[in-house]
């Protein structure tokens, strides 16, 4: 098949590009390189330096006639911009850009549209949380949606537009709601705290963990995400699916896993660690994906951290410390400041 992947120079997109090529598909990558890396793109793919908001994208689809479009292009908050400008950027990329891609799919008679969405920031807190003090909540794809951040709001809106194009124009789709994705990557592409912790500890520097959040999140290894995307090339028609580990871990858990794997005694610097009166551990139920196409995550947090550390050391020429056993009893959750 011929597959067009938007955002193919980013962390998830570059891994998918390689996997599609390894599976024998013809792949074209569309990316602005604003946040992605040209070096991350597999040289076997054809690269188009293009913004998804550009009208030329529709001409490209008309010319290339991809069978499948895998939409992984997304905005990223920029520290130099005020909050309202970042919110406008999210809307511009995730709504206007998405509509441009969807229109191009319809005009080019694309057979399927795969939409990379989110999950951890989408769902409404149940009322029982406030009464119980702490709730470990497993949510499925039908749970009430209540996104609070502009990024998540625009992604939820994007899902609505994808479904609209299916109803209105018959464009088949699969929506994948990812947990927080981690894996081996270039540092400049890193957005997950695991990569931050690994790089800081290997450089014998003290990581900074700041914030006042107390909820755990679901984390999924990039290898498991790639396998799910390969599955939905031919399955999961018009479904919305969690691609998740089915487990929740707080940021302190992540740090302890990395520190133990690296045999490091360095402690993080906690800035303003204020916990609220309630503590939620959100877990994304992945039963629907398991049933739809037999997918299941293969790496838990311990195995995933070990794999990422090994790959990171290989990439940067560091020696792996002796093997250690991961163990954590921490129940605190802090936000990483340097993401």
Describe the predicted segments one by one.
Residues 127-134, 152, 160-217, 222-226, ...:
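NAD(P)-dependent short-chain dehydrogenase/reductase
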